Amino acid sequence: MQRSPPGYGAQDDPPSRRDCAWAPGIGAAAEARGLPVTNVSPTSPASPSSLPRSPPRSPESGRYGFGRGERQTADELRIRRPMNAFMVWAKDERKRLAQQNPDLHNAVLSKMLGKAWKELNTAEKRPFVEEAERLRVQHLRDHPNYKYRPRRKKQARKVRRLEPGLLLPGLVQPSAPPEAFAAASGSARSFRELPTLGAEFDGLGLPTPERSPLDGLEPGEASFFPPPLAPEDCALRAFRAPYAPELARDPSFCYGAPLAEALRTAPPAAPLAGLYYGTLGTPGPFPNPLSPPPESPSLEGTEQLEPTADLWADVDLTEFDQYLNCSRTRPDATTLPYHVALAKLGPRAMSCPEESSLISALSDASSAVYYSACISG
């Protein structure tokens, strides 16, 4: 065995290790245990070649995939697809271009080969097409049950989609956009004549279908309804007063203070007819003709009601309100729809405003008792 020079490895080993290399007692202890003793020279440490080396570990196939040898075996066992005409032509052409341009990258060579193949005419491609057909027939004979299996399987990405029926708690998704509720829909229809909102109101605990959907909501939860519209649509909002009392409680919001005061003091029939058709009885800005208002006695009709004053004396006016008033908080009588205010068109209501206010207060009390019983039940 060839020995290393005396100064080999002296600078690599720490001083403590060099001092312990020739310490006495190590060989004696080894002889007492029956182990072979190697003579270590104090001047020449053990060479790295004399140390035992463990064999190289191959990566585990189950944990790290195939090793180098196993990968080669798998590639040899895998049946390759037959080459097409371009592959047959590019097999030799790639070698020629690589020898001419050794500095070019393989991707650049592939682009050059693709351009050169497209520039060839049919006569120049024919021999390669025939060779590719021969290889295909030979491959079919050698492997009759061959089925192409790509190496990498394309994994379809799973896109999580939120189903339209699933909504977060506290959120209401209207089935129609807010534009469907605007005044430009074609006619002044009431809320119940608009397209239905689907099953969004099923969980709001509505007691009866006759009630307005807004009654089951809190004042702050009606945000999905359209915002205040243009001034020309104020008449339509006043017509829908029982379904949106917060918009039509004060007529000055739409018409201004002078006109609102005139509406409060004017006879009931004329302003209500004006509210139905538009401001001051003029037709609204709708392209389609409006349906006529409910039949009601005009100012001349009040004179015809005088002979029937004895009939109105036996009628309880609050009985009509508990069926016709559909809101919890009853708005002013000037903003009620035509058929609701019509129940109070009598000689007493028109002649005695104090009695009318008393009847209105009694009507509010009866309505509160009626709807509190409905909600609690």
From Swiss-Prot:
Spell out the residue ranges making up region: Important for transcriptional activation.
Answer: 160-225
* UniProt keyword Transcription, yes or no: yes
Keyword Cytoplasm among record annotations: no
The miscellaneous comment for this protein is: Deletion of the DNA-binding and the C-terminal transcription activation domains causes no visible phenotype, excepting slightly darker coat pigmentation and a decreased proportion of auchene and zigzag hairs. The mild phenotype is due to functional redundancy with other Sox genes. The phenotype apparently depends on the genetic context: backcrossing the mutant into a pure C57BL/6 background leads to defective lymphangiogenesis and the same embryonic lethality as observed for opossum mutants.
Which InterPro entries has this protein been placed in? HMG_box_dom (IPR009071), HMG_box_dom_sf (IPR036910), Sox7/17/18_central (IPR033392), Sox_C (IPR021934), SRY-related_HMG-box_TF-like (IPR050140)
- Where are the compositionally biased (Low complexity) regions? 21-34, 41-52
The UniProt entry's GO CC annotations, sorted and at most eight, read: chromatin; nucleus; transcription regulator complex
Its source organism is Mus musculus
Q: Where can this protein be found? A: Nucleus
For domains, the record's comment is:
Binds target DNA via the HMG box domain. The 9aaTAD motif is a transactivation domain present in a large number of yeast and animal transcription factors.
This one is known as Transcription factor SOX-18
Linked disorder reads: Defects in this protein are the cause of the ragged, ragged-like and opossum phenotypes. In all these, missense mutations give rise to a truncated protein that retains DNA-binding ability, but lacks regions required for transcription activation. Homozygous ragged and ragged-like mice are almost completely naked, display prenatal edema and frequently die in utero or shortly after birth. Heterozygous ragged and ragged-like mice are mostly viable, but have a thin, ragged coat. Homozygous opossum mice display no visible phenotype up to 11.5 dpc.
Instruction: List every stretch annotated Disordered.
Output: 1-76
Look up the domain of life of the source: Eukaryota
Q: Which GO terms describe its biological process?
A: angiogenesis; blood vessel development; blood vessel endothelial cell migration; cell maturation; embryonic heart tube development; endocardial cell differentiation; endocardium formation; establishment of endothelial barrier
A UniProt-annotated Pfam family: Sox17_18_mid
The segments labelled Interaction with DNA in the record are: 81-94, 105-117
Query: What's the source species' lineage?
Result: Eukaryota, Metazoa, Chordata, Craniata, Vertebrata
Name the gene. Answer: Sox18
Motif 9aaTAD: which ranges?
318-326
**PROSITE patterns per the UniProt record, alphabetical:** HMG_BOX_2, SOX_C
